[in-house]
Structures are given as structure tokens and as C-alpha cells.
Amino acid sequence: LLYNYDSIIEDETDTVILVEGVFDVIALTRKLNLYNNPSVAVVATFGKKISDTQIYKLQAKGVHTIVIGYDGDATEAIKKTGDQLNEYFDCYVADIEDSSQDFDSMDFWEIYDTFAFRLKTLTEYKLNKIQI
């Protein structure tokens, strides 16, 4: 089950932003005005993990790129989900700077900065999170 899965148009939606919950979907769709943009969809996994069935559903729709937009405090879940998705999709992470925030609590400019300046490949994200 993926919330807002129906917004993915087969072979037309190229990029999916994957978030944890319903309010994140609503917030991103509204704040980025994605209502009439068939090439990008925001969907929720209802938590910090993704199942093989959910991955298959995304593949079946012809999605090529996944941006993981889990909450800032979900570092380990992002790494694990990224490893699962990286096998099948071009996978990126929207690295939320403040670990206490999510897209629902962020304003437009904070979201813009996250996607414009903090979008990372999975490898970049993992390297950035190494504690020395």
C-alpha cells in the first residue's frame, strides 16, 4: 500500500518522491504545486520502510527515479530503503538539514533548499553521515 499511488501515471511519471506519511504527501504536493505535474508524484510508505511489493508497484508504473524524502531523523531507515531501491531505480536522498523536521513542518524555501542544494546520491548521503 502506497498513499497517493494513483497519482503515478504509467510511463509518464518519471520521478517519485517517497515520504513517510500522508501529511508529508499533502504538504509537498501543495507547497511545490505538483497537482498538474504528471512527471513528478509524491507517495507515502506509511512508515520508514518499503516492501518488495511496494517496489514492484513503482516498477510496474515505469518510474525511473526515486527521491527518498523521509524525516530528518530517519538516517538508518534512509540507508536501508536506499539500498533496496538503488537496485531498481536512480535513487537520491532529499537530505533534510534539521533532523527534527519533515516536509509538513518546513516552509517553501526550506523545501526548495533541500531539493536544490541538499539532494544527494545514496553514496553521497552515506558518506556524509559517517561519524568520525
Regions found by a protein language model. Give the residues of each.
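Helix N-cap/beta->alpha junction signal
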Residues: 19-21
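Glycine-/acidic-rich phosphate or pyrophosphate-binding loops and their flanking alpha/beta elements
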Residues: 1-13
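TOPRIM fold recognition
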Residues: 13-14, 25-132
